[in-house]
Amino acid sequence: MCSSDLKSIPADIVRFKNGNENWIAFVGLQDGRPYEIFTGKIEEDAMYIPPKINKGFIIKVREENGSKRYDFQYIDRYGYTNTIGGISRLFNEEFWNYAKLISGVLRHGMPITNVVSLIESLHLNSETINTWKLGVERALKQYISDGTKTKDKCPSCGQETMAYQNGCLTCMSCGYSKCG
């Protein structure tokens, strides 16, 4: 089966704040690597996913009329399969377009560090989109292997010894961390 024909893929869930709103990122995985990302505002009355659920499956459903939607399926604490139909209804069109672009880059195998750098370099005018961007960066940084080095100089000691530790860029010389 061709990658573009995938109907169901494993997914991780990352929750984040976009301004004052609670948002959710569905990170679809292929071979344990991010393959696509969907984000949306959490609307518990329309789509409740228990806070302890952080894994499941994204299912692409093609309707008879040719339209498509995305569902999310997870196993609850009692072992029952739950399917949330139409998670795509949560996707604001503007954020959806950025997520489609990021997903396209992921599908073509760009290294996660480069994808994160690309997202970091986006200059967006809206404060809402900027806080969304930070949430997406945080979601994807989780997939960068510990010890992955960058060419960045440490803002504290000036050494080129920055590497990822637990999804956070950290100086291996002085211990400075961008995460605080």
Q: How would you name each of these model-derived features?
A:
Residues M1-S3:
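Short, small-residue-biased leader/transition segments that mark boundaries at the very start
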Residues L6-Q30:
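Structured beta-strand/loop patches that form or line metal/cofactor-binding pockets in enzymes
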Residues F26-S103, R107-H108:
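Function-dense linear segments that define catalytic or interfacial modules
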Residues Q30-G32, R107-T113, I144-G147, Q165, ...:
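Secondary-structure transition/capping motifs at alpha-helix termini
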Residues T113-S121, S126-T150:
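Long, highly charged low-complexity segments enriched in Glu/Asp and Lys/Arg with interspersed Ser/Thr
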Residues C154-C157, C171-C174:
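Short cysteine-rich clusters marking metal-coordination/redox-active sites
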Residues E160-M162, K178:
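Cys/His-rich microdomains that often coordinate metals
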Residues M162-C168:
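Short Cys/His-rich "knuckle" micro-motifs
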